[in-house]
């Protein structure tokens, strides 16, 4: 398999395992961006616990699934978004109000769209989950 984006490969393997009814999935390789993205997903209840295993070859992440995941995606290229333009991207990417999250990388770290609006920070779009 050709690795285009580590984050994209991670989200696709999690989504495919969730569709097949699996309870856990092993994601390789790991990175800081993937771990922060998974922590945002965990905070919103889309996945269960995850464990990072350092095997000195890129690392692995074991993710526990809970069946709440419908679709995930990476936004490529990573568009710049001002804090007052986040609402337009919510309407474009998410199916309905209150369903799903958009994850951004900001100067305050990797946040979901609600936290970014609360803190009045913009950033680059990473992906979406619903």
From Swiss-Prot:
Residue ranges of coiled coil: none
The domain of life for this entry's organism is: Eukaryota
Q: Which UniProt keywords apply?
A: Ribonucleoprotein, Ribosomal protein
InterPro entries for the chain? Ribosomal_uS8, Ribosomal_uS8_CS, Ribosomal_uS8_sf
Query: Which terms in the GO cellular component ontology are assigned?
Result: ribonucleoprotein complex; ribosome
Matching entries from Gene3D superfamilies are given as: 3.30.1370.30, 3.30.1490.10
Entry-linked Pfam families: Ribosomal_S8 (PF00410)
Q: What GO MF annotations does this protein's record show?
A: structural constituent of ribosome
Presence of the UniProt keyword Ribosomal protein in the record: yes
Q: Which GO terms describe its biological process?
A: translation
The record, for PROSITE patterns, names: RIBOSOMAL_S8
Record protein name field = Small ribosomal subunit protein uS8
Q: Which organism is it from?
A: Agaricus bisporus
């Amino acid at each position: 398999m050709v690795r285009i984006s580590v984050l994209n490969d991670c989200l696709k393997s999690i989504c495919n395992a969730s569709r097949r009814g699996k309870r856990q999935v092993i994601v390789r390789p790991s990175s800081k961006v993937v771990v922060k993205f998974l922590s945002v997903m965990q905070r919103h209840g889309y996945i269960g616990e995850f464990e990072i295993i350092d095997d000195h070859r890129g690392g692995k992440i074991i993710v526990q699934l809970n069946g709440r995941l419908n679709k995930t995606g990476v936004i490529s290229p990573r568009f710049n978004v001002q804090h007052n333009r986040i609402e337009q991207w919510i309407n474009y990417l998410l199916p309905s109000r209150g369903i799903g999250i958009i994850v951004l990388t900001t100067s305050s770290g990797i946040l979901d769209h609600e936290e970014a609006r609360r803190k009045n920070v913009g950033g680059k779009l990473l992906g979406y989950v619903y």
